[in-house]
């Protein structure tokens, strides 16, 4: 059974690129803002959320707080072009500018219970 990923990203081109990098290995659900991400998370309970931070309607950091407020064990990887720390967001961070192998490795690492990204909180 494929792992289910929720990809929250407001830039359509990046959604297409992420889908290409992930290939057919995962079931991918998309959200284009933080509010949609929370709704999709509540509906589908994905194995991992890949969350952009700067999005319309509701920011990714607000969506992260809302999801973790319901399920503190939810697996979320912040994917951002901005310099946020894992301590600020409460989840591991993968800074945009990564290559396909780094992206897939971060996803696999998170799915297997390890912190991923360029910096991560000690709790992960």
Regions found by a protein language model. Name each.
Residues 55:
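Receiver (REC) domain active-site loop signature in two-component systems and cognate sites
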Residues 33-36, 59-62:
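Acidic catalytic/metal-coordinating carboxylates
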Residues 12-29:
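Two-component/phosphorelay signaling modules centered on CheY-like receiver
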Residues 42-44, 66-74, 83-85:
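Conserved phosphotransfer cores of two-component systems
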Residues 98-120:
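C-terminal output helix
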Residues 9:
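Conserved acidic carboxylate
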Residues 52:
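Active-site residues of response regulator receiver
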């Amino acid at each position: 059974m494929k792992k289910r990923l929720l990809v929250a990203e407001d830039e359509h081109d990046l959604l297409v690129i992420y889908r290409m990098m992930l290939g057919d290995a995962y079931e991918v659900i998309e959200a284009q803002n933080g509010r949609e991400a929370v709704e999709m998370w509540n509906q589908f309970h994905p194995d991992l959320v890949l969350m952009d931070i700067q999005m319309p309607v509701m920011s990714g950091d607000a969506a992260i707080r809302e999801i973790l407020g319901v399920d503190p064990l939810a697996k979320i990887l912040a994917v951002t072009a901005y310099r946020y720390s894992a301590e600020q967001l409460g989840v591991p961070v993968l800074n945009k500018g990564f290559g396909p192998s780094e992206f897939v490795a971060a996803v696999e690492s998170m799915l297997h219970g390890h912190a991923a990204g360029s910096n991560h909180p000690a709790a992960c």
